[in-house]
Amino acid sequence: MLTEYTSDYLLDKKIKIFQPINGYRASTDAVLLAAFVSGFKGGKILDIGSGTGAVSLCLAQRLKQFSPQITGLELQPELAELSNFSARQNGFENIFYQNADIRLGTKENNVAPCSFDVVISNPPYSEHDLPSPNKSKATAHNHSDFDLRHWLEFCLKAVKPFGKIYIINRAEALPEICSIFSGKAGNLQILSIYSKQKQNAKRILICAQKDSKAPCRLLPPFFTHSDDGSYSEAAQKILRSGLGFDDIV
C-alpha cells in the first residue's frame, strides 16, 4: 500500500478517506455523484474508475440501511489497495475494490455482463488547456487511448436490463453522452451543476436507464455556491449532511 498518504474526511466527518499525498484526490464531484443515486433498495453496485473510493464510500454511508454490495474497478493498483483500507476503516465489509483495466473488457476483469443493479462512474476527461503535471492524476482523468464511448459501453454491458447508470462529466460532453446512450438507454435525467448564478454549467450529472424508451428529463439546476462564495444551503445538505438530491427537493 502507498506509504505517503493523508487521512481526510467527507460528509462532515462521517467518512474517513485515505488518499495519496501526490496524485489523484477526491473532489466535490464524487460527493455530488453519490448523492445523485436514487431509488436504490438493495442489490449490487459497480463503481467504474473508483479512484480513492470516495463515490462508493459516500454512497455506502447514505444507503447503509440497504447494505449495498459494492465493487470498485480501478486502473491504479495502489489506489485500489488504499480504497480497500478506507472501506475497512469505515466499517464497510460489503465494499471491495480491485485492480482492473476496463479497456480489456468485462470478461477479462471478472465482471459478469448484466449483473449490476446500478453502475456509477466519473469517466476520465481531459482538460486540454490544463494538463496535469502529476502522472497519477493524469491517469485518473484521461485515458488517451480509451474514449468516453468505450467507457460508457462498458457501463452498459455491466448493468442489468433496466438497471441505472449514474455519471458525472464536463457539461460540454452532454451531446456526446446522449449520442452514446441513444438506442441503448433512455429515461435520461440530466442535472446541470453551476458554481454560481449567471455562470455557465461546468458539470452535468446524468442518470440513464438501460433499455428504457422513456423520454429525457431536464432537472432543475443546482448551484454549489452563493454569491458571497460560501456553499449554498442545498450544497451544504449534500456535502456535509450527506443527503441525496431527492432529499433536498
Cite the ranges covered by each PLM segment.
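Class I SAM-dependent transferase core
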Residues: L2-F40
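Conserved beta-strand segments of alpha/beta enzyme cores
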Residues: K16, Q69, N94-F96, G186-Q189
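Short loop/edge segments at beta-strand edges and connector loops
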Residues: Q19, N99-A100, N169, S192
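Residue-level signal for inorganic ion chemistry
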Residues: L33, N122, W151, A208
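Conserved SAM/SAH cofactor-binding pocket of Class I
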Residues: F36-S132
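Mobile active-site "lid"/loop adjacent to the S-adenosyl-L-methionine
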Residues: P123-H150
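Conserved Class I SAM-dependent methyltransferase catalytic core
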Residues: F146-A201
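SAM/dcSAM-binding transferase cores
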Residues: N200-V249
